[in-house]
């Protein structure tokens, strides 16, 4: 039974890995082509480019972590190796979440229509707002790295003191739980900001539909379509990131009980977010959608010939 579950999870993980690299790689390729051709990118182009890169790094890091843990275990890694693994995960996870949050703020400022002076002030200074959020989140990143480094220093000290394999594994399980809890704490702020942006955009859509109803105009005007498209992308991000968030909690159980199958399941759940959301971004962005349709048409023509 265990071997069958292991085989199924392995196939799902490989599919997520391939699909995630293809969708994120496609976003990187199209935006790089636009960058070379035009000499610059729009705000959303830069956000999508670095978001896709951070997700590709995150996907590769999760896969490498799984392989290393399943084959060698982390009980005998050096401090340098452990820092490399942990810092890569922290940085890629941080930008994967914060850039998606910045994308939510971008949609809110670009599409929502509020008459409040504060919102209008932020809307007129959209690029500055996005830049401030981007620079501000670096403070969270530095704090996160410092905290993780403290945990690594403490674990390495315990590692050198404990000679037996069982005590080292037990220490690493405790260390892993501390790191996961740290990641959960630092993920709350950007997730909350994205959720608030989503709620405000829903409220903006509701007000817009009321206005359309009073003016006896159709509900499928360009503004309504823009609202719905942005909401579709944002709700998919929130739901998929919720699964990624849950995977953190799921990881606490196998780490505490040292079950490799449980850890594999939590990583499979976690991979679903960076692998799937980029595909939704392709469908929701006109340039990316047109490029994907062109590629599909080209491939179909190639098969016929």
Swiss-Prot record:
Disulfide bonds: none annotated. One of its GO terms (molecular function) is bitter taste receptor activity. The keyword Ubl conjugation does not apply. One of its GO terms (cellular component) is plasma membrane. It is found in: Cell membrane. Keywords: Cell membrane, G-protein coupled receptor, Glycoprotein, Membrane, Receptor, Sensory transduction, Taste, Transducer, Transmembrane, Transmembrane helix. It is a multi-pass membrane protein. InterPro entries: GPCR_Rhodpsn_7TM, TAS2R. Its main location: membrane. Glycans are attached at residue 162. Residues 29-43, 110-128, 204-232, 284-305 are cytoplasmic. It comes from the Eukaryota. Pfam families: TAS2R (PF05296). The chain crosses the membrane at residues 8-28, 44-64, 89-109, 129-149, 183-203, 233-253, 263-283. Residues 1-7, 65-88, 150-182, 254-262 are extracellular. Receptor that may play a role in the perception of bitterness and is gustducin-linked. May play a role in sensing the chemical composition of the gastrointestinal content. The activity of this receptor may stimulate alpha gustducin, mediate PLC-beta-2 activation and lead to the gating of TRPM5. Belongs to the G-protein coupled receptor T2R family. Most taste cells may be activated by a limited number of bitter compounds; individual taste cells can discriminate among bitter stimuli. This is Taste receptor type 2 member 13. It comes from Mus musculus (Mouse).
